[in-house]
């Protein structure tokens, strides 16, 4: 455990098969992109430490298969999570339509009601868009989620998605526990009104 790490957070990435969950994870953790990346079998897991507004957090990021046959993994997968990234493909409307199913699953299996959710519309680098940005934003607002559009291929919005999610988690009292409570760690906050950090207008904090 690093002495300067404020906390360790469990982050989940969920969504239909083929929406780019693993690609987003690899872009964020390893800064790589593989257009031929195979579908996840079961659960993948990566760890990355980031600093948000002066607060360093270690992220344990779980990437799960979107296929129905792997749903038996669900209960243990959701247990203890503080943040969820729900991904759809902006070029496949069916993945957007099925977001409600994923939210229902989240409500069923999540062990707490103050979990922070981020909606990500992936693959904005492609031209054959079927889901408008405003549709994603409207859905996110309806369900009190953070929202961003991104591209794992070009890296647009990827870093921002994780940073905004972590920032919101840290700002939520009781959602996480400090691993340095006896070391006098002081939680720092971004100045009020400073706005979207490095998002460049991508993120909407709702």
UniProtKB/Swiss-Prot annotation:
List cellular component terms (GO). apical plasma membrane; cis-Golgi network membrane; endoplasmic reticulum membrane; lipid droplet
| Single annotated GO MF | GTP binding
Query: Cysteine methyl ester: which positions carry it?
Result: 203
Keywords from the UniProt entry: Acetylation, Cell membrane, Developmental protein, Endoplasmic reticulum, Golgi apparatus, GTP-binding, Hydrolase, Lipid droplet, Lipoprotein, Magnesium, Membrane, Metal-binding, Methylation, Nucleotide-binding, Palmitate, Phosphoprotein, Prenylation, Protein transport, Transport
- Chief subcellular location equals endoplasmic reticulum
Q: Which SMART domains match?
A: ARF (SM00177), RAB (SM00175), RAN (SM00176), RAS (SM00173), RHO (SM00174)
The UniProt entry, under InterPro entries, shows: P-loop_NTPase, Rab, Sigma_54_int_dom_ATP-bd_1, Small_GTP-bd, Small_GTPase
Pfam families on file = Ras (PF00071)
Q: Does the record bear Metal-binding in its keywords?
A: yes
Q: Where does GTP bind?
A: 17, 20-23, 34-35, 40, 66, 123, 125, 152
User: Which cofactors are reported in the record for this sequence?
Assistant: Mg(2+)
Which compartment or compartments is the protein found in? Endoplasmic reticulum membrane; Golgi apparatus, cis-Golgi network membrane; Lipid droplet; Apical cell membrane
Residue numbers of Phosphoserine PTMs: 144
Q: Where is the lipid attached (S-palmitoyl cysteine)?
A: 199
The catalytic activity of this protein is classed by the Enzyme Commission as: 3.6.5.2
Entry-annotated residues carrying N-acetylmethionine: 1
Hydrolase as UniProt keyword: yes
- Which reaction(s) are listed as its catalytic activity? GTP + H2O = GDP + phosphate + H(+)
Q: Name one GO biological process term.
A: brain development
Give the binding site residues for Mg(2+): 22, 40
Activity regulation, free text: Regulated by guanine nucleotide exchange factors (GEFs) which promote the exchange of bound GDP for free GTP. Regulated by GTPase activating proteins (GAPs) which increase the GTP hydrolysis activity at the ER membrane. Inhibited by GDP dissociation inhibitors (GDIs) which prevent Rab-GDP dissociation.
UniProt short sequence motif Switch 2, positions renumbered to this chain: 63-80
> What the protein does?
The small GTPases Rab are key regulators of intracellular membrane trafficking, from the formation of transport vesicles to their fusion with membranes. Rabs cycle between an inactive GDP-bound form and an active GTP-bound form that is able to recruit to membranes different sets of downstream effectors directly responsible for vesicle formation, movement, tethering and fusion. RAB18 is required for the localization of ZFYVE1 to lipid droplets and for its function in mediating the formation of endoplasmic reticulum-lipid droplets (ER-LD) contacts.
Entry domain remark = Switch 1, switch 2 and the interswitch regions are characteristic of Rab GTPases and mediate the interactions with Rab downstream effectors. The switch regions undergo conformational changes upon nucleotide binding which drive interaction with specific sets of effector proteins, with most effectors only binding to GTP-bound Rab.
How is the quaternary structure described?
Answer: Interacts (in GTP-bound form) with ZFYVE1. Interacts with ZW10 and this interaction is enhanced in the presence of ZFYVE1. Interacts with BSCL2.
Q: What is this protein called?
A: Ras-related protein Rab-18
What species was this sequence derived from? Bos taurus (Bovine)
Lineage of origin = Eukaryota, Metazoa, Chordata, Craniata, Vertebrata
């Amino acid at each position: 455990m690093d002495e300067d790490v404020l906390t360790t957070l469990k982050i989940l990435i969920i969504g239909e098969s083929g929406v780019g969950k693993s690609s987003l994870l690899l872009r964020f953790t390893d800064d790589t992109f593989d257009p031929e990346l195979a579908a996840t079998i079961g659960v993948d897991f990566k760890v990355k430490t980031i600093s948000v507004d002066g607060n360093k957090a270690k992220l344990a990021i779980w990437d799960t298969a979107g296929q129905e046959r792997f749903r038996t993994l669900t209960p243990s997968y959701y247990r203890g999570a503080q943040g969820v990234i729900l991904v759809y493909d902006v070029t496949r409307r069916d993945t957007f339509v099925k977001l409600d199913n994923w939210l229902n699953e989240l409500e069923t299996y999540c062990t707490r009601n103050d979990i922070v959710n981020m909606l990500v519309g992936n693959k904005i680098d492609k031209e054959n868009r079927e889901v408008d940005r405003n549709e994603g934003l409207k859905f996110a607002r309806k369900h009190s989620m953070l929202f961003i559009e991104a591209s794992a291929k070009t890296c647009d919005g990827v870093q921002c998605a994780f940073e905004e999610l972590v920032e919101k988690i840290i700002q939520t009292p009781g959602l996480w526990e400090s691993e340095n409570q006896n070391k006098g760690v002081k939680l720092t906050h971004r100045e009020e009104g400073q706005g979207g950090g490095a998002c460049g207008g991508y993120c909407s904090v709702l």
